[in-house]
């Protein structure tokens, strides 16, 4: 590491010591020491040799370069390349000064200043990255602690589960759940739900869907309207059927037929009666019909009676098949 001059030079080659002047003065008191040679303990290694300059302690032992591949990757870093460029520019500047090349001095100094500014900015960024690395180390340590805690909790849960399995259990009931359901029960339940459900909006608005009015069979609304219209046209017959008056009318007709059979001998008298009945019918048609006392009393009784349940409630929620 001691620079020497060329052998063909007329001057003698003398080694240049890198030891400071104060150290050399202190070494003069020691007769055995040679002031022309530097002390091995005070020798300073080059800052551009990362494999030797990196300190090896417990904190950064993992960051020490171990292989040539790591060294090549280290040399490819932008900051290391800038440092090498800075060193090259300094060597060129020193060579230009030694050779008295004044035309290159200004250009070299400008390049050194720009390279120095870039290195300064990269050093500031390097400090930020170093702080980030410290935070990453802290987070990794915390992650390890949390992982250990989670493993411990899982182990405890597994042990508790095994203890619960060892505990005595209640006897199982012999009653089995009937999984086989009759189709009729499903249909009844579906009929009950159909009154309160409808097709979803996504299905109802699908294209090429057949509307219920275009079905071959009549829709539910048309069936309801038809039944209500038929009931409104035959209201009296339905009321009589519910009240049981049809049997009384049939019995009255049977009695009249028996009376007619007994009076076959009096044909002449019946003809006169028929003629008189026809005359009275003509008079009654010309006059407005007068309500008899029997009819009025009957109507009052019907009004006083409670309304009859005709079982025409098509929307009875208790009915199984009502739509």
Swiss-Prot record:
UniProt GO BP: regulation of transcription by RNA polymerase II
Localization per record: Nucleus
Keywords, alphabetical: Activator, Coiled coil, Nucleus, Transcription, Transcription regulation
Record flagged with keyword Transmembrane helix: no
Start-end of Basic and acidic residues biased regions: 241-262, 282-303
InterPro entries xrefs: Mediator_Med4
Region described as Disordered: spans on this chain: 1-36, 241-323
Matches recorded under Pfam families: Med4 (PF10018)
Entry's Gene Ontology cellular component terms: core mediator complex; mediator complex
One GO MF term: transcription coregulator activity
Coiled-coil features, chain-numbered ranges: 79-167
UniProt biased composition (Polar residues): 11-36
Annotated function: Component of the Mediator complex, a coactivator involved in the regulated transcription of nearly all RNA polymerase II-dependent genes. Mediator functions as a bridge to convey information from gene-specific regulatory proteins to the basal RNA polymerase II transcription machinery. Mediator is recruited to promoters by direct interactions with regulatory proteins and serves as a scaffold for the assembly of a functional preinitiation complex with RNA polymerase II and the general transcription factors.
Family the UniProt entry places it in: Belongs to the Mediator complex subunit 4 family.
Subunit structure: Component of the Mediator complex.
Designated name of the protein: Mediator of RNA polymerase II transcription subunit 4
Annotated organism of origin: Candida albicans (strain SC5314 / ATCC MYA-2876) (Yeast)
């Amino acid at each position: 590491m001691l620079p020497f001059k060329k052998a063909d030079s007329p001057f003698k080659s003398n080694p240049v010591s890198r030891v400071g002047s104060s150290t050399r003065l202190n070494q003069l008191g020691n007769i055995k020491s040679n002031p022309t040679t530097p002390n091995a303990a005070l020798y300073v290694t080059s800052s551009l040799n990362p494999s030797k300059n990196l300190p090896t302690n417990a904190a950064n032992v993992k960051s020490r370069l171990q292989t040539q591949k790591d060294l090549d990757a280290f040399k490819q870093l932008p900051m290391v390349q800038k440092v090498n460029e800075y060193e090259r520019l300094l060597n060129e500047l020193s060579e230009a000064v030694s050779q008295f090349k004044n035309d290159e001095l200004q250009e070299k100094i400008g390049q050194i200043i720009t390279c120095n500014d870039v290195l300064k900015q990269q050093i500031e960024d390097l400090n930020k990255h170093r702080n980030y690395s410290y935070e990453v180390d802290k987070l990794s340590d915390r992650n390890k602690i949390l992982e250990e805690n989670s493993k411990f909790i899982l182990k405890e849960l597994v042990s508790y589960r095994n203890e619960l399995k060892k505990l005595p259990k209640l006897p199982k009931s012999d009653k089995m759940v009937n999984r086989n359901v009759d189709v009729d029960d499903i249909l009844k339940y579906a009929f009950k739900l159909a009154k309160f459900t409808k097709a979803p909006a996504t299905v109802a608005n699908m294209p090429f869907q057949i509307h219920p009015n275009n079905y071959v069979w009549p829709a539910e609304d048309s069936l309801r309207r038809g039944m209500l219209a038929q009931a409104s046209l035959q209201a009296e017959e339905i009321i009589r059927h519910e009240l049981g008056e049809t049997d009384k009318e049939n019995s009255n007709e049977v009695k009249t037929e028996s009376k007619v059979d007994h009076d076959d001998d009096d044909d002449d008298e019946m003809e006169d009666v028929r003629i008189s009945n026809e005359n009275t019918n003509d008079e009654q048609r010309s006059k407005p019909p007068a309500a008899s006392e029997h009819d009025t009393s009957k109507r009052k009784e019907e009004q006083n009676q409670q309304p009859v349940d005709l079982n025409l409630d098509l929307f009875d929620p208790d009915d199984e098949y009502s739509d």
